[in-house]
């Protein structure tokens, strides 16, 4: 059975995509969000759910998880006209009668207009590259931290030397039984102040060492084998949980197949966020224009303009004057 055509399909379920979907709901149109990950929220939800964000208007500070929760709650007001598709990667889209055919790795979708809000593309964690690593992943081997209290009373080993690794180590110092950081260099790449705090903390620092093997039973890792760089010294670290903080790699390989105009790895847009294809718009980190500032707050400001332009494109004969939300919601 042919999928019904939604008014607007938003590619990307990060903060900008979620707010665009909310605003589209506010304007009374039907919306579909297609997200490649297994959950909504994008980088704030996946990469730094418990880190503080300080540049969201009206919030002195909030975590990535709180930002995501608020956006999803805001969108839930229009759940009757919003459809969410998770773990679907958009491969191509083509102009068809009445709109666009959007093909993903799972299905074919139809939409009258498209708003691209996929950031810098799909992203995946950089792994240890060790045999059996995949077997332990998401059991007691993690590439990001959603809840600090899940590590309470545990022996935690963290691999990495960047901001995330150092921040997680400091955050877990008073929660875990012990925290050990393994880094391949003596120098850390994290913020200087955080590194100083780390060096004066109770966190065990093992540098310069590299992971060589994982040992465990079933789906649970029990030991990490590490070797000192350029030496034969080998250590076995007992652990309850292992956090691999090597960062994430992004890929916009599919974005390049969408037959749009690009500037480096982003999509070139007009001042109204129109791409080189009529009816397709781009916002957030996916969009490129002169003077662009890559902030979440910037994307929030871009979303209403793109939605309004999409509605004007879909319904050119409708009275599309923008009304303030105070007049639309009781």
UniProtKB/Swiss-Prot annotation:
Keywords: FAD, Flavoprotein, NADP, Oxidoreductase. InterPro entries: FAD/NAD-bd_sf (IPR036188), FAD/NAD-binding_dom (IPR023753), Fd--NADP_Rdtase_type_2 (IPR022890), Ferredoxin-NADP_redctase_2 (IPR050097). Its EC number is 1.18.1.2. One of its GO terms (molecular function) is ferredoxin-NADP+ reductase activity. Its cofactor is FAD. The keyword Flavoprotein applies. It is an enzyme of class 1 (oxidoreductase). It catalyses: 2 reduced [2Fe-2S]-[ferredoxin] + NADP(+) + H(+) = 2 oxidized [2Fe-2S]-[ferredoxin] + NADPH. Gene3D superfamilies: FAD/NAD(P)-binding domain. Binds 1 FAD per subunit. FAD binds at residues 35, 43, 48, 90, 123, 285, 326. Homodimer. Belongs to the ferredoxin--NADP reductase type 2 family. PANTHER family: THIOREDOXIN REDUCTASE 1-RELATED-RELATED. This is Ferredoxin--NADP reductase. It comes from Streptococcus pyogenes serotype M49 (strain NZ131). The lineage of its organism: Bacteria, Bacillati, Bacillota, Bacilli, Lactobacillales.
């Amino acid at each position: 059975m042919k999928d019904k055509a939604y008014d607007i399909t938003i590619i990307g379920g990060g903060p900008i995509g979620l707010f665009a979907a909310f605003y589209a709901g506010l304007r009374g149109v039907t919306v579909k969000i297609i997200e490649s990950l297994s959950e909504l929220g994008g980088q704030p939800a996946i990469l730094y759910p418990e880190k503080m964000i300080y540049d969201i208007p009206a919030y002195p500070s909030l975590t990535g998880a709180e930002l995501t929760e608020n956006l999803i709650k805001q969108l839930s007001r229009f759940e009757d006209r919003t459809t969410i598709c998770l773990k679907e990667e958009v491969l191509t889209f083509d102009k068809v009668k009445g709109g666009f055919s959007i093909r993903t790795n799972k299905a074919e979708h139809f939409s009258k207009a498209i708003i691209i809000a996929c950031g810098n593309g799909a992203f995946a964690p950089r792994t240890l590259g060790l045999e059996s690593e995949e077997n332990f992943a998401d059991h007691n081997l993690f590439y990001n931290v959603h809840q600090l209290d899940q590590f309470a009373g545990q022996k935690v080993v963290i691999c990495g030397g960047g901001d995330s690794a150092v921040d997680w180590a400091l955050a877990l110092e008073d929660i875990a039984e012990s925290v050990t950081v393994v880094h391949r260099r003596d120098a850390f790449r994290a913020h200087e102040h955080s590194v100083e705090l780390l060096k004066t903390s109770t966190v065990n620092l093992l540098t310069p060492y590299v992971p060589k093997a994982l040992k465990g039973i079933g789906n649970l890792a029990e030991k990490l084998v590490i070797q000192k760089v350029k030496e034969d010294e080998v250590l076995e670290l007992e652990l309850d949980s292992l956090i691999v903080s090597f960062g994430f790699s992004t890929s916009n390989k599919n974005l390049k197949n969408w037959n749009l105009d690009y500037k480096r790895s982003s999509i070139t847009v007009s001042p109204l966020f129109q791409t080189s294809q009529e009816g397709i718009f781009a916002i957030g980190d996916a969009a490129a224009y002169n003077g662009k500032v890559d902030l979440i707050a910037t994307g929030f400001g871009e979303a209403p303009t793109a939605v309004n332009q999409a509605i004007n494109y879909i319904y050119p004969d409708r009275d599309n004057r923008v009304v303030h939300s105070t007049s639309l919601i009781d």
